[in-house]
Amino acid sequence: MRCFKATIAYDGAYFLGYAKQPNKLGVQDKIENALNTLGIKSVVVAAGRTDKGVHANNQVLSFHAPKHWNVAKLFYYLAPKLAPHIVLKKLEEKNFHARFDAQKRAYRYLLTKNLKTPFLAPYIACGDYGSLDLLNSALKQFTGKHDFSLFKKEGGATTNPNRIIFNAFAYTAFIMGHECVVFKIIGDAFLRSSVRLIIQTCVQYSLEKITLAEIEMQIHNIKATIRTPIMADGLYLHRVYY
């Protein structure tokens, strides 16, 4: 068997998350079904398991295929089976594990105060976000190693809630005809819905609805103030570092 590394982009609006679903509407379902039609039966491992509605610019996968499949041949037959909502950007033969070998994962979140068209609603979140300076003041609180037990969706199981945030910041950009604030958060890994809870917390602070002290108490597992994540629209798994 050969091990392949695939880099894909997908539109999360058409899936119920990356992981396999009972109704077969996960990204993993679509890819494994496509491979099955080619006679390839393999579990497809992803660098990050995105939630329902979350997109990916550069999700990385690993899977195995029989030796008679080379890169060019597999790309030729697989890419059309994934289109249009999944794009196979790159395929290479590489002996690695997409999840366990990943060192960092970067997420981006796009938020605008005024969405001009409903057709972009799944791709740019809409809502007030207050001040850029206040957003960055809040984001700084999350850098470093922390126990993120109070920054994960209830029911999200994990054996180790400790994660490292290497960098977290926000900036403004003009994207798809909209003035947006762009959040970028880079960490070693993330708990379920953790990125969205972090961003929601920062937005609520920027809108002066919570204090830095309350953020610190939640980071230190003293008291949870924000338990509802921000909407999934506008969140992208942007890059995986190896």
Curated annotation (Swiss-Prot):
GO terms for biological process: tRNA pseudouridine synthesis. The active site is at residue 51. It comes from the Bacteria. This is tRNA pseudouridine synthase A. It catalyses: uridine(38/39/40) in tRNA = pseudouridine(38/39/40) in tRNA. Homodimer. Belongs to the tRNA pseudouridine synthase TruA family. InterPro entries: PsdUridine_synth_cat_dom_sf, PsdUridine_synth_TruA, PsdUridine_synth_TruA_a/b_dom, PsdUridine_synth_TruA_C, TruA/RsuA/RluB/E/F_N. Substrate binds at residue 107. It comes from Helicobacter pylori (strain HPAG1). Its EC number is 5.4.99.12. It holds the Pfam family PseudoU_synth_1. One of its GO terms (molecular function) is tRNA pseudouridine(38-40) synthase activity. Keywords: Isomerase, tRNA processing. Formation of pseudouridine at positions 38, 39 and 40 in the anticodon stem and loop of transfer RNAs.
